[in-house]
Amino acid sequence: MALAREIYEHYWEKGWAVVENVYSIEETEHIAALATRLCEELMQEDDYIVDSSDDGARAPRKLDLPFERHPDLRNFALDRRLSSLVGEFINDQPLLLADQIFMKPPHFGSKKPYHQDNGYFHCHPGDKVLTAWIALDDVDEENGCLRYIEESNKGPILPHLPQPGEPYNFVPPADLIDLSKEALAEVRQGGVVFHHSHSLHTSHHNESDR
């Protein structure tokens, strides 16, 4: 799958870019249904993957390393359409470090605070590391699309500090995040959002009924 020049330039200038129509609706619906089934099975044994609503209801939060759990999930993550785009962004042969599926059910959980992926990954050089975020549903502001601090990819990795009561969140100091440069990355089902390992990003609570 060829990468348009303007998308490539947007990625390196702003730190993120959207490529629509990488996967089909049928493919993403199959993966979403499979991930939901696996999460529901795992919820019985692992509270780490569970979110709770205000009324105490439980729903799956995320699935770590899904490519290890089912051949369809492995093929989805390693699909040539995706890997060819990654290779064009980084001008190198891509390797998969890890993958996750975030469920983000409506009215559950909380927003993911601003962070940089390489604040967690510690991979070098940072220009050769990116995240490919595949939309299994239409994603917009209402249901919690990704938000970026544009051009933060050009800066350093900031100190990421643990948050009390949030064992999976490490975040930079708020005064180092320039919210005047925030941009929303809306994407349709089957599209992919790519971002640089230094790009500051967040996603808010799902306020929709989707």
Predicted feature locations:
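Short helix-to-loop capping/linker segments positioned immediately adjacent to catalytic or ligand/cofactor-binding
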Residues: 74, 118-122, 134-137, 178-184, ...
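Aromatic-acidic/polar surface patches that form glycan- and anion
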Residues: 24, 74-78, 125, 179-188, ...
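Ligand-binding loop in jelly-roll beta-barrel domains
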Residues: 204-210
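Short, conserved beta-strand element in jelly-roll/cupin
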Residues: 115, 122-141, 186-188, 194
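Short, charged/polar surface micro-motifs in flexible loops or helix N-caps
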Residues: 82, 106-109, 126-127, 138-141, ...
